[in-house]
Amino acid sequence: MLCNLLIAEPAQAQQRPVLTTESLDDQPVIREVRITGNDAIRTTRLRQRIQTQANRRVLSIPGFTWWRWVYQFGDTVGGRVGDAFRASGEAPAYLDPGLVDNDVERLRVFYEQQGFRDARISADVVEGDDSDRVTVHFRIDEGPPTYLRSLEYRGLQGLPEPVQATIVNESVFDDATPTDENPFKLAIANQRYETPLLLEERQRVLRALRNGGYAAVSRDSIRALVFTPQPDSFDVRMRVRPGRRYRFGDVQFTVEGPLSNSSTRQPTVDVPVDSSAGYAPTVAATIRNEERLSPSLLERALQFTPGDYYSQEQLLATKRRLEGTGAFTFTNLTPQLSDSLRPAPDGEAFVPIQIETRTRERHQLRAETFALQREVVSDVESELGLGVGLTYENANVLGGGERFQMRTAASVATNLDSLTSVQLEAEPSLTLPYLVYPFGGLDDWFDLVDTRTRLSLSGLTARRDDLRLRIRARLGAQLRLELDHTESLSSFIDVVDLTISNPDTLDQFSERFLDRVLGPGDGTGITDPVQRRQIIEDYTEPQFNSALRYTLQSATANPLRRRQGHVYEGAFEIGNVLPLALDWFAFSPGSLTSTVPGFGGQTLLYRPYLRGQVDLRRYIPLGSGRSTLALRAFGGVAHPFGIPDVVPFDRRYFSGGGTSVRGWGLRELGPGSTTLLAPGTQTQPSANGDVANILGGDIKLEANIELRTRIIRQLLAANWLLTSFVDTGNVWFGPRNPGLATAATDDQPARASGRFRLATAPQELGVGAGLGLRIAWEFFIVRLDLAYRMHDPSPLNDDVFRNGFRDPRLHFGIGHAF
């Protein structure tokens, strides 16, 4: 019988001396590192365990070691300029025999931890045609694996049944079932012995004990004995010594504020306590140099009941609630085990909890500048927008962690020929770190990690000189509930989302814009009188929109870097049911007019609709993390109901642009294979298809794939990434939308084009591809993309590379495309 004691992290390989930098210069350069003989473990995993590496190659082309060349060029230049090149390059990968020996030992230890006790590792250095170039070849003979046969827990007999069940039934091993003769022993099938997996199991048992009241348990409380009943299998016995079971005792909040008046107050913190064990813990607070903080914030944040059994999970939930308010810069929650008390000699122990926090400055004022592609007011061309904003924030306006923010912004946009638009906007918002009545019960029903309520108002006015349009005012109001189910899964419920828009026209509106959108009226363009009227209404009539929306989001990716993880989002909304009900029951009983009264005698149009969409994004790191494969798939459908047969303009879908299908400009793609009329032509479509889809669509499908590779490190304090991408997608009219009329031909009668048809949709997908550059600072990413059309579904551009490599699309933006 072989007995091993597992009480620490996996064993480390014994290190041997390596060469100094000066002595490395006399060694040959490593051309390639090979690993062979590994059948059970992937090569990528083994490469992560060794330090002997060759220089990176561009696109894996032999000899194309761009980063080494950059480094050597810096050596040649010297000085500060040379230092900059060396910092962005990669030093030559010289052979280090001591490092190779250490890698052999690392691989041997790694294989032993993976259950291959008899694995043999060797390394050969093979000279190439050039004497200064070598290949390092690691040869692996894995030998037979060792399997884990059983896992027995000792010391669980005195634990509460719920804690026992959690430990036994939630093992990290997939094929583990309790044996008949011993309920605390698991029979494990088809599981290779892995030391890291056993350590993970030990950590899981620790969590179960700490969440079951055993606050003093540590890693030393669990020891694993490994037995070898057969040469190819192990039995593991975990001895658990949980110690004493604790309850939450007295709770002391200590709050430090940013003021310097040295004031101290001790308000009452009123929370329920559990006195069933013969002791009623107290909850107290000491607040220094902070005049605004209310004890109600502390009461809501407390996620455990004093007097109940100790749970580390509930303690961490309290910390998350405190930090989620945004009122604190620092939080620290500590169980005071040394001060634990037992009110009765034979009674249970109570552990006091010390909660220390530090509040942030309440008032903050910040200015910002920003660049954007205008999408607010019915664009017809890609525009570069520049703006300035000013934001005031009060981090604790009502004393209970409520955050007030007032943002104002002004922006202008240009198409490089002239100033095309001016926009002013303001948005006050109030974020509450709790759910308002009557939604507070959702927190208890779903056992949420964190909750917020956001109330916001918005106002916007804008002028579009190129379209001869202006928006006198667009007013909005929103009540949103934010529910965090886990750290990565959240729900957003827009209980109220109201907008009132009052557009107006300027001189020459008809000539510059309307005639092109509606067509010449000769049987082409938009011929349906209902849709013609609705298009005019989009740009000339006041409108009212309301929506009830639910969004479910799972996000594990960093929102800025997006190097790994995912963002999965699904949303469904029903719109304008409120004005529909008011129209039917209050304003025109028994009939529908699709209008409701507005201000000053105006009538407001509304269009009921349903809308659902799915947005899936996945980020896969490649190699050693220098590259990322980004994938995105999007699908959305909007469907009108009631009298109107189109959805509101701002709830339609558009395709094309820097974050969509990049071979086209902003909103230039679709609907379907149709092409809108070009300005000034009246009868002919644009020759290059560069006319925005003003109508939008009811159905949208898109897919994107992008490879991002870091090519330069820390040049101008930023990482430089080269990207290659392929995008595809389009938008279509839905079944109720009248669509665009096409003239009759000898082969087919006139019909509405732009409609979604399953048989023709694949041929109507636009495809674009290109290269891009990302300049990534720590908190800021600049994006440049150059894209070409691979397949244009419009009638005049139905060939692949019809224009060769002429007329590419250049997109500039902030942040990654997706």
Go through each PLM region and give its residues:
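C-terminal soluble interaction/assembly domains
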Residues: 304-309, 394, 746-749, 756, ...
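Sec/Tat signal peptide C-region and signal peptidase I cleavage site
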Residues: 9-13
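Flexible, small/polar- and glycine-enriched "cap/hinge" segments at structural transition points
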Residues: 719-722, 729, 734, 770, ...
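C-terminal outer-membrane beta-barrel translocator/porin domains of Gram-negative envelope proteins
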Residues: 272, 281-288, 370-381, 393, ...
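Periplasmic polypeptide-binding modules associated with outer-membrane biogenesis and secretion
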Residues: 14-373, 385, 408-416, 421, ...
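Gram-negative/organellar outer-membrane beta-barrel architecture
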Residues: 166-167, 172-180, 191, 291-292, ...
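A generic beta-sheet turn/junction motif
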Residues: 129-131, 144, 244, 622-624, ...
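Bacterial N-terminal signal peptides
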Residues: 1-5
